[in-house]
């Protein structure tokens, strides 16, 4: 049976995962037009999550960040004045779409808030139960 602390741990793991997601989106937006030191475009980063079962109770599942994956690819624009332009005048830009990143950010924030609400409600139930036992 799930105890109160496991419920708090599950909500906390969800908040952790969404915080990683928000940080990844922020990094993508910050590097929207960035290049690596070798002149290649910054690759979009995407967190990869995995479900981890509680070994003591398989009905309890936590969220874990398995890795932060680079998504290869780029956009081509014509800008012959750019120092990173190729011999035809095209520049490879990062494969980051700001609108998609903002949608991902909004989704991550809402998921974080839902986990925070679940955490807060669980804590409140615990506090009220403890008060009733006094």
From Swiss-Prot:
PROSITE patterns in alphabetical order: FLAGELLA_BB_ROD
Highest taxon above the source species: Bacteria
UniProt xrefs under InterPro entries: Flag_bb_rod_N (IPR001444), Flagellar_basal_body_rod_CS (IPR019776), Flg_bb/hook_C_dom (IPR010930), FlgC (IPR006299)
The keyword Isomerase belongs to this UniProt entry's keyword annotation: no
GO biological process, one term: bacterial-type flagellum-dependent swarming motility
Assigned GO CC terms: bacterial-type flagellum; bacterial-type flagellum basal body, rod
Location in the cell: Bacterial flagellum basal body
Keyword Methyltransferase: no
Keywords, comma-separated and alphabetical: Bacterial flagellum
Summary of subunit composition and partner proteins: The basal body constitutes a major portion of the flagellar organelle and consists of four rings (L,P,S, and M) mounted on a central rod. The rod consists of about 26 subunits of FlgG in the distal portion, and FlgB, FlgC and FlgF are thought to build up the proximal portion of the rod with about 6 subunits each.
Stated family: Belongs to the flagella basal body rod proteins family.
Descriptive protein name: Flagellar basal-body rod protein FlgC
The species this protein was found in: Aquifex aeolicus (strain VF5)
